[in-house]
């Protein structure tokens, strides 16, 4: 029996370092540090890309866009997301909804979440009402609680496109 739905879960984490722009959900957030990574290190879009690819059974972002490939150095994660989602759609799936949690001490996520939702809705061609982004802290526990990095967890629901 073919199931008409699939669920994918994505996770990513990047360290905060001075001297880099902080790009989360495709939004340039004014902050004293940015995320360290081979691409723009957009932790939210990396976790979302993994959730979509995983749900479709298409691997993960590291296989599709390896950080050992110089072609992806400094890459815009929105471009990577759109390319990955094109593969998901080519495999016969489309996104139904996205639920994301960003975990960090700072910056505050809530003021930037609406712009992140707009970007994701545009990149996936879906209704913004089907996308939810939350910000959480770890009450000063762990690396995120100490302000050393940002983590993202994303769940995505796909439905058969046919």
Curated annotation (Swiss-Prot):
**Top-level taxon in the UniProt lineage:** Bacteria
Annotated a divalent metal cation binding lies at: 12, 14, 46
For this protein, the record's PROSITE patterns field holds: ISPF
Please give the Pfam families that the UniProt record associates with this protein. Answer: YgbB
Gene Ontology BP terms: isopentenyl diphosphate biosynthetic process, methylerythritol 4-phosphate pathway; terpenoid biosynthetic process
In short, the EC number is 4.6.1.12
Q: Which GO terms describe its molecular function?
A: 2-C-methyl-D-erythritol 2,4-cyclodiphosphate synthase activity; metal ion binding
Q: Where does 4-CDP-2-C-methyl-D-erythritol 2-phosphate bind?
A: 12-14, 38-39, 60-62, 65-69, 143, 146
Keywords from the UniProt entry = Isoprene biosynthesis, Lyase, Metal-binding
Q: Which reaction does it catalyse?
A: 4-CDP-2-C-methyl-D-erythritol 2-phosphate = 2-C-methyl-D-erythritol 2,4-cyclic diphosphate + CMP
The entry's function note states: Involved in the biosynthesis of isopentenyl diphosphate (IPP) and dimethylallyl diphosphate (DMAPP), two major building blocks of isoprenoid compounds. Catalyzes the conversion of 4-diphosphocytidyl-2-C-methyl-D-erythritol 2-phosphate (CDP-ME2P) to 2-C-methyl-D-erythritol 2,4-cyclodiphosphate (ME-CPP) with a corresponding release of cytidine 5-monophosphate (CMP).
Family (UniProt): Belongs to the IspF family.
Kindly provide the name given to this protein in its UniProt entry: 2-C-methyl-D-erythritol 2,4-cyclodiphosphate synthase
Q: Which organism is it from?
A: Azoarcus sp. (strain BH72)
């Amino acid at each position: 029996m073919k199931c008409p739905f699939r669920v994918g879960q994505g996770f990513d984490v990047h360290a905060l370092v001075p001297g880099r722009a902080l790009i989360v959900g495709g939004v340039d957030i004014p902050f004293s540090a940015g995320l360290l990574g081979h691409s723009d290190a957009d932790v939210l879009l990396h976790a979302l890309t993994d959730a979509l690819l995983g749900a479709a059974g298409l691997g993960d972002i590291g296989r599709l866009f390896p950080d050992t490939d110089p072609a992806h150095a400094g890459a815009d994660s929105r471009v990577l997301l759109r390319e990955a989602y094109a593969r998901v759609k080519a495999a016969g799936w489309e996104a139904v909804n996205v639920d994301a949690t960003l975990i960090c001490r700072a910056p505050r996520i809530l003021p930037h979440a609406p712009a992140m939702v707009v970007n994701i809705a545009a990149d996936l061609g879906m209704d913004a009402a089907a996308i939810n982004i939350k910000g959480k802290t770890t009450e000063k526990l762990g690396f995120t609680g100490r302000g050393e990095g940002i983590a993202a967890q994303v769940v995505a629901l796909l439905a058969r496109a046919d």
